[in-house]
């Protein structure tokens, strides 16, 4: 794993560019979306056959498939899923916002009305892999928010079936509307509807570049959570950290994808050299060695700063999806961290704890967007309406000022809207 010393000037070049896809990929996605809008289920079936190599006549998961999923899933794993649900729900319930109102002395009442979205569509990656954790992390905040209709889509395997873990996770949350479809065609079906699926108000969940581009295309007609890029981890550590643990944590993200980013930031060259050697050692025995090696080679790096203050500045420049702080006193550094999707404090809080079990959401901003965005949360499934109720006395007191403001902007009809009421009051 390559090692670099880092200075203030060099930090400016660290930001990773966002993969917006090629023009050919964007054209393909637009074509798929238009086809689904025009031809509905027929188009979805056609693309499922083309891309997933399976003919699916009826994409809706049946009651029998749910029953088979429960039968085939190990009882221990069922308990793990249920415990994770409890943890995730407990955390997200603390995010729930309520409507509020207040009154001024002149009789004015102002407020904010909080309302859950009517519907949401969740995309869960599938095909060759299974991600029941994605079901939990996307569905639970929507349920806590009060979303009434939640639809889930996920690509089928080559046998036309879905992962038992995914089905059981959904069933444990009361989600029955699950459709075997993936890719840009599934995003289009959620956004615009087909004969089988009613359109939804918001689409969440990660996917490949075609899913990401499709979400970008439909945004505005529906809401989306974010455009997720490859997974990222930054580990910030001092000489008190254990090198083998740091290496294991870096590789936990490197094995996700050849495009995943794994970065170690420290103020100790000795630790940097030991961790680099440990990464190479652990790579040799990884089942997903080819993927992890490509990630480490192309997007992995160890940055050595002169001081911990400079190391923290490097972290804030990177604005990573996941940040682990493994130092003598990680809590003391927390206040200096400005930009990170999720922050894991101490050696007993490695990133997989948050991926699956702790409670906070694992749908996190990537590609440096933690500078201005947040993890998926309950408020993403709520919307707010401003409430304004002026009393007659308040209106009379401020009417002249409001009309003057309208004319300042050259909007005469606005001013007359105010004055029409003034005249009626004065009669």
Curated annotation (Swiss-Prot):
**Annotated positions binding NAD(+):** 123, 185, 208
Q: Which cofactor does it need?
A: Zn(2+)
Question: InterPro entries in the record, alphabetically?
Answer: Ald_DH/histidinol_DH, Histidinol_DH_CS, Histidinol_DH_monofunct, Hstdl_DH
| Any Pfam family the entry gives | Histidinol_dh
Going by the entry's taxonomy, the superkingdom of the source organism is recorded as: Bacteria
Cite the CDD domains for this sequence. Answer: Histidinol_dh (cd06572)
What does UniProt give as GO cellular component?
A: cytoplasm; cytosol
Give residues annotated as binding substrate. Answer: 231, 253, 256, 322, 355, 409, 414
The record ties this protein, via PROSITE patterns, to: HISOL_DEHYDROGENASE
What keyword terms does UniProt attach to this protein? Amino-acid biosynthesis, Histidine biosynthesis, Metal-binding, NAD, Oxidoreductase, Zinc
Q: Does the keyword Ligase apply?
A: no
Which residues of this UniProt protein bind Zn(2+)? 253, 256, 355, 414
UniProt EC number: 1.1.1.23
Top-level EC class: oxidoreductase
In which pathway is this protein known to take part? Amino-acid biosynthesis; L-histidine biosynthesis; L-histidine from 5-phospho-alpha-D-ribose 1-diphosphate: step 9/9
Per its record, the protein catalyses: L-histidinol + 2 NAD(+) + H2O = L-histidine + 2 NADH + 3 H(+)
Q: What does the record note about the cofactor?
A: Binds 1 zinc ion per subunit.
What role does it play? Catalyzes the sequential NAD-dependent oxidations of L-histidinol to L-histidinaldehyde and then to L-histidine.
Q: Which HAMAP family match?
A: HisD (MF_01024)
The entry sums up its family as follows: Belongs to the histidinol dehydrogenase family.
Protein name as catalogued: Histidinol dehydrogenase
Please spell out the taxonomic lineage of the organism that makes this protein.
Bacteria, Bacillati, Bacillota, Bacilli, Bacillales
Q: Which gene encodes it?
A: hisD
């Amino acid at each position: 794993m390559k090692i670099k010393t880092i200075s203030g000037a060099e930090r400016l070049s660290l930001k990773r560019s966002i993969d917006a896809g090629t023009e050919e990929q964007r054209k393909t996605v637009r074509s798929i979306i238009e086809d689904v809008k025009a031809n509905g289920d027929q188009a979805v079936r056609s693309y499922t056959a083309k891309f997933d190599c399976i003919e699916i006549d009826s994409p809706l998961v049946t009651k029998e498939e749910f029953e088979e999923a429960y039968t085939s899933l190990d009882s221990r794993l069922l308990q793990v899923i249920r415990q994770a649900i409890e943890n995730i729900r407990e955390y997200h319930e603390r995010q729930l916002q309520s409507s509020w109102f207040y009154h001024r002395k002149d009789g004015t009442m102002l407020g904010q009305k909080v309302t859950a979205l009517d519907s949401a569509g969740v995309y869960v990656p599938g095909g060759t892999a299974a991600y029941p954790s994605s079901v939990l992390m996307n569905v639970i905040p929507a349920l806590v928010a009060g979303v009434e209709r939640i639809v889930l889509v996920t690509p089928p395997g080559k046998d036309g079936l879905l992962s038992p873990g995914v089905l059981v996770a959904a069933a444990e949350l009361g989600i029955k509307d699950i459709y075997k479809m993936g890719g840009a065609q599934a995003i289009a079906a959620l956004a615009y509807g087909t004969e089988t699926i009613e359109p939804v108000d918001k689409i969440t969940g990660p996917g490949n570049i075609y899913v990401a581009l499709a979400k970008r295309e439909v945004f505005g007609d529906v809401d989306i959570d974010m455009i997720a890029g490859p997974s990222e981890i930054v580990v910030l550590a001092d000489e008190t950290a254990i090198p083998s643990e740091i290496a294991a944590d870096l590789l936990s993200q490197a094995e996700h994808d050849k495009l995943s980013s794994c970065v170690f930031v420290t103020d100790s060259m000795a630790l940097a050299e030991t961790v680099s050697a440990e990464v190479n050692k652990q790579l040799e025995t990884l089942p997903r060695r080819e993927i992890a090696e490509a990630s480490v080679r192309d997007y992995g790096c160890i940055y050595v700063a002169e001081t911990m203050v400079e190391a923290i500045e490097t972290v804030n420049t990177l604005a990573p999806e996941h940040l682990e702080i493994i130092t003598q006193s990680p809590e003391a550094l927390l206040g200096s961290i400005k930009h990170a999707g999720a922050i894991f404090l101490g050696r007993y809080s490695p990133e997989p704890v948050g991926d699956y079990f702790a409670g906070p959401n694992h749908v996190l901003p990537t590609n440096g967007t933690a500078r201005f965005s947040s993890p998926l949360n309950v408020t993403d499934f709520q919307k707010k309406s401003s409430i304004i109720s002026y009393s007659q006395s308040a209106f009379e007191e401020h009417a002249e000022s409001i009309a003057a403001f309208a004319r300042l902007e050259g909007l005469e009809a606005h001013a007359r809207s105010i004055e029409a009421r003034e005249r009626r009051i004065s009669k």
